Amino acid sequence: MRRKLEILKEVRKAYRKTKRPIWKTVCEILESSRRRERAVNVSKLDKLVPNGAYVVVPGKVLGFGLISKKVTVGALDFSASAMEKIKKAGGKALYLDKFAKKYSKKGGLILIGG
């Protein structure tokens, strides 16, 4: 729970700094109840996003399926297998607080699971 609050704090900071609607949407999703938390499989990422994309997942990334694209993913949490598969494909798996610090001003972010 504490980790989620720290992440929410960083995402709010990114929204205040950039005023980009994607960060406001992510804040609203993270503030909702745990029962409504999102989960996305790596196979869905592989199907929906182009190679080299920057993806925001306001929930957990799960390891079902395969991923062949090099993507940078920022998520609330990752399963061990999802993190391994993303890194094996040449991508990066970052927790949402670090992702928000590093890529808050980046254009072309894709929201999956929102």
Tell what function each PLM region has.
Residues M1-G114:
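Extended polybasic, low-complexity segments that bind anionic RNA or targeting/receptor surfaces
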